[in-house]
Every structure is written in structure tokens, then in C-alpha cells.
């Protein structure tokens, strides 16, 4: 697989995980992320800043700087992309608000997900169809703890949630990393 294809695949994975994370953006926390596709990782969030780690790449989203950094630890290099403020998925929202494009949210039942008392909803988004979302109702953890396809073909969930504020250094480019550019990607914005 070419380097560019690999980068685009990783960017796609990180973006899909970011959509899952945005509902908890008002909180400071860290958690393990588990996905049905095996792209497991770690998320750190504080004041709208998001760091997502997978086995291949680290993504740091900085709304305050309107940037996304994609770090490749293996090569100590990073890509920098503009964060598009007009894109609705980049706007932080508490979990009790509608998702971008959401047209319906129906309460299904109360159940426990990974030890968190949660309310299960069927959420319909205009161009993406419907999925299930579990919102924790535990005090202090008002966030989406799991999302899943109606047909169970995919799912993402947070486990081992810690409400400790992450180290601010996690939201910066580590020392020793070199900025790289990729032709054709300079105008892309998330």
C-alpha cells in the first residue's frame, strides 16, 4: 500500500473516531477506544482539544488554533491540516444536544455499558441513516459511551474512562518531530 493511501486511510479512521468523540468535548477525560474494526486506541480530551492515538498514528485536534496535526511516531514526522470551522462535525456539543444533521432521537431503554448506567437512543441523521447511541447517565460522565449500527455491523465504545485532566503536553507536537508536506493535501481541511 502506498504511503499516500495509508495516510488517507488513517485520516479517515481518525475522522470517524473524532465524530464519536465530539459529543464529550466539554469534558476533561481520557479513555480507551474500542472499535469493531479493530482500530483500538486511546483518547484524551480537555477544553475541546482532542488527542486520539492508534497503533499507527496520533491525531491532535486544536480548535483554538484551527488545526489538526497527524503525527507518525515511527518516522517522527507530522502533517498539519486546517480545521474547517464551517464543518458541523467540528463544532463541540454536549451530549444532550442534537448531532449535526440529526433529524430524530428516540429513547429506547436504560442499560449498563461497561459499568456505566446509560440511556440507549436510536439516532437518525439525514444523510447517514440510523444508529444506536448510549449516553451515560452516571453523575460526572454525561457523554456518549458507545455507538453502534442498527444491524450491529460496526460499533465504537469508550472503556476505562478517567475524569482526570490530561497533561497539557499531550495536545502539543512532541519535541523532535519534523513537519512534512504532501502534494495535493495542502488545501484539505477537516
Can you annotate each of these PLM segments?
Residues 1-5:
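N-terminal secretory signal peptides that target proteins for export/translocation
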Residues 8-9, 123, 182:
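Sequence-pattern detector for short linear motifs
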Residues 10-20:
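Bacterial N-terminal signal peptides
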Residues 22-42, 89-98, 103, 180-182, ...:
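N-terminal cleavable signal peptides for secretion/export
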Residues 24-74, 107-112, 117-120, 124-132, ...:
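N-terminal mature ectodomain segment of secretory-pathway/periplasmic proteins
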Residues 39-93, 141-160:
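An acidic-aromatic
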Residues 101-104, 109-119, 127-132, 137-190:
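Non-transmembrane domains of secretory- and envelope-associated proteins
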Amino acid at each position: 500500500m502506498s504511503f499516500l493511501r495509508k495516510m488517507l486511510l488513517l485520516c479517515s479512521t481518525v475522522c470517524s473516531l473524532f465524530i464519536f468523540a465530539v459529543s464529550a468535548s466539554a469534558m476533561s477525560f481520557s479513555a480507551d477506544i474500542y472499535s469493531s474494526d479493530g482500530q483500538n486506541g486511546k483518547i484524551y480530551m480537555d477544553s475541546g482539544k482532542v488527542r486520539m492515538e492508534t497503533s499507527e498514528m496520533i491525531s491532535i485536534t486544536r480548535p483554538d488554533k484551527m488545526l489538526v496535526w497527524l503525527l507518525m511516531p515511527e518516522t517522527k514526522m507530522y502533517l498539519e491540516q486546517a480545521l474547517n470551522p464551517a464543518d458541523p462535525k467540528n463544532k463541540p456539543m454536549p451530549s444532550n444536544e442534537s448531532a449535526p444533521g440529526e433529524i430524530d432521537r428516540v429513547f429506547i431503554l436504560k442499560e449498563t455499558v461497561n459499568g456505566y448506567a446509560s440511556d440507549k437512543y436510536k439516532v437518525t441523521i439525514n444523510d447517514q441513516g440510523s444508529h444506536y447511541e448510549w449516553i451515560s447517565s452516571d453523575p460526572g460522565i454525561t457523554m456518549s459511551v458507545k455507538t453502534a449500527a442498527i444491524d450491529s455491523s460496526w460499533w465504537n465504545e469508550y472503556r476505562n474512562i478517567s475524569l482526570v485532566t490530561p497533561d497539557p503536553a499531550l495536545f502539543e507536537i512532541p519535541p523532535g518531530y519534523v513537519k512534512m508536506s504532501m502534494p495535493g493535501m495542502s488545501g484539505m481541511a477537516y
